[in-house]
């Protein structure tokens, strides 16, 4: 609880998370962790990150999270100040309480209570660039870890995975995300003289019909069906008597493990080609692959730890948006479990203190079960 309040009271609107990282670093240094602050500034804005470890042997269990937060909006709209860390009627208020300073605080408390593993290591990967472009955060830290030969055996990410109550859901994977732009060129002209123009809109409509006529798939063992949404159609035309010279459509696909990034791109192009219309297709940078940590000893360890405290075995899920787990998957198996996500990014973001206490207990059980299983 003390860590959660201290983190909330350290304003850290992305990417300015240095004060909140200081809270984590100071606590870990005092407990004997070797702490490294990693600053990257590819995008021109310095971003502070942290990697800390106690122990030198395997297995290395890592907790990954972020202490940057989205802007609070109008502070006057909050029941308590967004960075107050106020507690009222057993509820902790503040930006980041759920997403995800609460989980960072809970694992920090759990790890310090456990101490140094007799065999193996505990580590923390905490970023200040998850709510922003995610360029100079976890992705760069993962590259840095790989370059120095740092081995992480398993990772738990503290995203707010539970839809309704603590213990509902553990994320064992995430869908991939791909965004694209379709451009159709025409020739601008007067609507009264269509023979002198070339309207691109009907051709774009035919292309979009071909793209969306059939489902991409029917889902897989652990993933729902892939889903393509057309999110914008634009012609840049406000007049009623002008045929536009070009038309564009933007789309996003959330896709499962039946596709790789390359095979999905090929399928999109194949569908568009069936329309028989000329088009230009471009894909936006920043696409991510789907990933899955298959059920096995690590996933079971997490599920058992949750059940130990809540009395219920959580659902394994791959729903929702992307997270920094998409970067960590290249290092090791990764699973996500944190608080209830109902108020994340909202005015009056809050979590019951009882949930924080229970999450800390879950993380304590997870650490104990992990080393009993993997360090034996």
Swiss-Prot record:
Reaction equation(s) it catalyzes: N-succinyl-(2S,6S)-2,6-diaminopimelate + H2O = (2S,6S)-2,6-diaminopimelate + succinate
Listed cofactors: Zn(2+); Co(2+)
Binding site for Zn(2+) 1: 66, 99, 159
Alphabetically ordered keywords of this record: Amino-acid biosynthesis, Cobalt, Diaminopimelate biosynthesis, Hydrolase, Lysine biosynthesis, Metal-binding, Zinc
Free-text remark on how the cofactor is bound: Binds 2 Zn(2+) or Co(2+) ions per subunit.
Enzyme active site: 68, 130 (proton acceptor)
Signal peptide (residue range): none
A molecular-function term among this protein's GO annotations: succinyl-diaminopimelate desuccinylase activity
E.C. designation(s): 3.5.1.18
Binding-site positions, Zn(2+) 2: 99, 131, 345
Function as written in the Swiss-Prot or TrEMBL entry: Catalyzes the hydrolysis of N-succinyl-L,L-diaminopimelic acid (SDAP), forming succinate and LL-2,6-diaminopimelate (DAP), an intermediate involved in the bacterial biosynthesis of lysine and meso-diaminopimelic acid, an essential component of bacterial cell walls.
HAMAP family xrefs: DapE (MF_01690)
Family, per entry: Belongs to the peptidase M20A family. DapE subfamily.
Name of the featured protein: Succinyl-diaminopimelate desuccinylase
Encoding gene, per UniProt annotation: dapE
